UniProtKB/Swiss-Prot annotation:
Catalytic reaction annotation: Release of signal peptides from bacterial membrane prolipoproteins. Hydrolyzes -Xaa-Yaa-Zaa-|-(S,diacylglyceryl)Cys-, in which Xaa is hydrophobic (preferably Leu), and Yaa (Ala or Ser) and Zaa (Gly or Ala) have small, neutral side chains
Sequence similarity: Belongs to the peptidase A8 family.
Major localization class: membrane
Annotated InterPro entries: Peptidase_A8
GO BP of this protein: proteolysis
Name of the protein in its database record: Lipoprotein signal peptidase
Amino acid sequence: MARTTTLGRGGLLTWLGVALIVIVLDQLTKTLILGHFQYGDARHVTGFFNIVRVHNTGAAFSFLAGASGWQRWFFVGLGLVAAGFIVWMLRSQGHQRLFAWALSLILGGAIGNVIDRLLHGYVVDFLDVHWAGWHFPAFNIADSAITVGAALLILDELRRVRRG
């Protein structure tokens, strides 16, 4: 049986490489935002999209953002536990391509946001989608990767159920 740590198709290192690409893109874009925007700045891009700089001390949709500070370490711990579980899953399920893509995107996004929490105490969000005065909560590349990964997990499960 082939080792799952090889660079071959479906090997653990392949999927960790995908996660690393997400982490690098996420951190690069956040570094650019931190270097060129002040907190609260916004730049109009289109009629439905802005680049902003906001800090999220909570989770998705700023859940628990108003808590007293304990949530920083809670989400760091949760992210690290999730990362460990995902790596374990990739070691055994890396041959299932869609599933592994999904997990790799989620892994990269989770680690990207954990890095922010460790470095800054908050997650840097900067993508602002809006329509007719309604703004979706700002998000970042890591959040996008997690969302796409979750959608791929659902798709993978639907395909698995359909196959019987």
